[in-house]
Amino acid sequence: MTRYLTLHSIEEAKSIINESLKKLKNEVEEVDLFNAIGRVLAEDVFSNIDIPPYDRAKMDGYAVKAEDTYEADEDNPVELKVIGSLKAGEIKDLEINNGECVEIATGAIIPKGANAVVMVEYTERDNDRVKIYRAVPPMENIQFTGSDIMAGELVLRKNTKLTPRDIGVLAAIGKSKVKVYKKLKFGIISTGNEIISPNEQLEFGKIYDINSYTLVSYIKTLGYDFEFFGIAKDDKEELKEKIKKALKCDIILLSGGTSAGVGDLTETAIKELGGKILVHGIKIKPGKPTIIGKIDNKLIVGLPGYPTSCLTIFDVLFGDEKNVVKAKFPVRYISAKGRVEYLPVILVKHKNGFSAYPITKGSGAITSLSEADGYIIIDENKEILENEDVEVHLFGDVKVGLNIIGSHCIGVDIILKEAKLLAKTINVGSLGGVLSIKRGEADIAGIHLLDEKTNTYNIPFLEKYKVKDAVLVRGYIREQGFMFRKELGFKSIEEIIEHIYKLEFINRNKGSGTRILFDKFLKDYNINPKEIKGYNIEAKTHSAVATAIAMKKADIGLGIRTVAEQYNLAFIPLANEHYDFLIRKERFNDEDVQNFIKALKTAKLPFKKPDNCGEIIWGG
């Protein structure tokens, strides 16, 4: 089988999808108003009646002739005769003359002769007489016929997606049924020998089905229906049987099985069922191996198996148009060769607008999208320069809260939980945190930067990078050292040095305090980094380092004791380090920042707290 013989443009793929959707979406059905929420109107809706259909009282009180009240005030009330009462829904032949009034309830019909309502709060009743303590002008507290909606008025337009408020309008004009476009129904099939349902016991080599659940959720937010046909193993006949059952739906979605490799059977199954392949391969990252085909004129789309690729392609092909905001891109970035890249980003709001931080975990990480506020579209073979303007296509509303950008530490999560704060945490390393404070993006940056000359933490770097308008708050002391699996049996730093060129390392990202500490260690012991296996393999968090070691992807790496213990790894200490918090002065007195500092002092942390924890140690 030829692998991606012709890569199609995104526009070509979307054109095929839109052509099919246009035909399907033109089918109309009539539904009960109780079932109309989220549906799309297939016609303009006009009102046949006035709303309200009669003049009615806005308040409880007394229907009066306004001119009878003109002399009334708190010291000189006007006294009127009460000739009757009206409740909402009551119809009585009442007509008031000068010097008379009618007791009236909210929503009741205004009696003949009345042109205003005095609120009950400004009256005093005595049998069939009432004192009025406030004058009212004509039309006061009356809602007149057709003042909300007039007969013949267009109330909702064709193609409106019905909200609860729209349903209320339809009910108000007497519509019990409404014509809407027929709901599209998606048939969903997951594929792969490794895929199991989330309710099953996870065995080695298996992964839980993510794509079915994310696709169903997205489909429902678009107002469509679905039917799940289960998980198909990498067996052609089993896949064909599930596809045949799914053909009762309008559109069939398969996830996985599109990469044209061993066990990727989607294209073969479609062809053997008499179908036609329209697209196999799109110039997009992520999602290159996408398949679009037809069986019996039913659209069938093979989505990539990686969660981010799968959801991104579905969003591009079927999603609603996104709102767009402009932002600065804080780092240099080179896009994929020959493909348009949809790069997920986290938005950080600051005084000059937004900055868009890229999420580069890869298409296999579901958190790439769960953490993202939106994505930027990068043309093929394009380089984005540092601080270049970009357009961010939003998934929804931009999340608000503290912007915490800097070095990863589980202590930050504990503090946020203790303070019950909403925050975005972006792990870019300590130096990245310092620079984000300088750019005005971060509110707080966790840093632990060891200066080789003075052998002290953080303050020398703030002076070196000429940080202004910020304060450094003392945090806590973490124990950094080597994490490794217990069977390796090392007892000392000297033993690690003795075997260092035989071990497979996993390193931290450039600019992180841990990376700086590791490089200093290598320099102090005259160890050549180029001869360290895995020196250039980088992880962005202590947890990622520990995971790689626990899963035997690496033998050893530098991290904090707390994380080593969490992953049941051995630990040999290398240094005690100060993990402090750099905070912008303009945000220092904000309630959220002060609550963060308070929680820093009070939270039970797995680290040593110095006596001046939570106090300003620089820049005050």
Curated annotation (Swiss-Prot):
Top-rank taxon, per record: Archaea
Keywords of this protein's UniProt record, alphabetized? Molybdenum cofactor biosynthesis
Q: Which GO terms describe its cellular component?
A: cytoplasm
Q: Which PROSITE patterns match?
A: MOCF_BIOSYNTHESIS_2 (PS01079)
- What GO molecular function terms would the record report? molybdopterin molybdotransferase activity
Q: In which pathway does it act?
A: Cofactor biosynthesis; molybdopterin biosynthesis
Spell out the Gene3D superfamilies in the cross-references.
MoaB/Mog-like domain, MoeA, C-terminal, domain IV, Molybdopterin biosynthesis moea protein, domain 2, Molybdopterin biosynthesis moea protein, domain 3
The cross-references to InterPro entries, in alphabetical order and at most eight, read: MoaB/Mog-like_dom_sf, MoaB/Mog_dom, MoCF_biosynth_CS, MoeA-like, MoeA_C_domain_IV, MoeA_C_domain_IV_sf, MoeA_linker/N, MoeA_linker/N_sf
GO process annotations (BP): Mo-molybdopterin cofactor biosynthetic process
Q: Which Pfam families match?
A: MoCF_biosynth, MoeA_C, MoeA_N, PBP_like
- Family under the similarity heading: Belongs to the MoeA family.
For this entry, the protein name equals: Putative molybdopterin biosynthesis protein MJ0886
